[in-house]
């Protein structure tokens, strides 16, 4: 059983502020603190760490659209970041992931492939592949104004299968999850299938694979469901079952789901949702899983009501190892007020807030977005 170290470095981006935060979480003291505020090229709403752990990739919310790679500098008391390269993007990206050949970007109207060098740095060149996700008259709207609106109504995420041979792209606007085959020698993609969501109003936002490679969890932004799909023939996804993040009595139209992630042992799946307006708290929900990745029950094992709506965030990122008492640690970011929490979860006791840090100041409203654990 994997056991957490005594402390972790965590990197955190924001939606609008040019800062990258280095945080440390002391597992035994159960304490989270800011160690460094690194200079950033803009607001980084999504972060990804290269497979070797030496490069940070980031989306940039700003004009002109671009993507960024940073060197992760280690050797001191805590990790810091150093800019390695900016590259232009046709549209503002919402999500990136990487292997040792390429970085993949979901940016609303399309999915892009950017190549990286042997050190993981983005090459100083445009995307080598772009897959248009728009259909019919939608293509006429695909111009420079499709920034945040494009992300809200288009391709929103990109994640690789555990063996690195497939890329899953959740597309809110097309109500589907696209599958691409990955050439591991070159990093290039080939479109494989378009997998329509179960409900006409689902709006897939993120698609996260189980370590066994056969199950993919699709987070539905509009309906607040976490759905399990099975990879059927290496080309298509088949719906199995789903659980709702919010309680039955809540109005789905007042929420927009944000994130889906697994516990370190892949025996629990977590989903989070935000309130559409201030005064509507969001939820983080957990379901126990069978060893094959299917739901033990689609009824929630535990729910946690968040302190605020979460703003644009209420994003969870799970610690890669269990805590000393078998607990699952995760970060929860809030952009409404501007704080980050560490949550601990066990299937027996549910969720608890371990620590909280206010990031916003009286002089500046800072909007925490997402984190990565190092």
Swiss-Prot record:
Name assigned to this protein: Muconate cycloisomerase 1
Cited Gene3D superfamilies: YVTN repeat-like/Quinoprotein amine dehydrogenase
Function recorded in the entry: Catalyzes a syn cycloisomerization.
Family per record: Belongs to the cycloisomerase 2 family.
EC number per UniProt: 5.5.1.1
Swiss-Prot/TrEMBL catalytic activity: (S)-muconolactone = cis,cis-muconate + H(+)
One annotated GO molecular function: muconate cycloisomerase activity
UniProt keyword terms in alphabetical order: Isomerase
Biological process annotations from GO: beta-ketoadipate pathway
Pfam families from the UniProt entry: Lactonase (PF10282)
Subunit record text: Homotetramer.
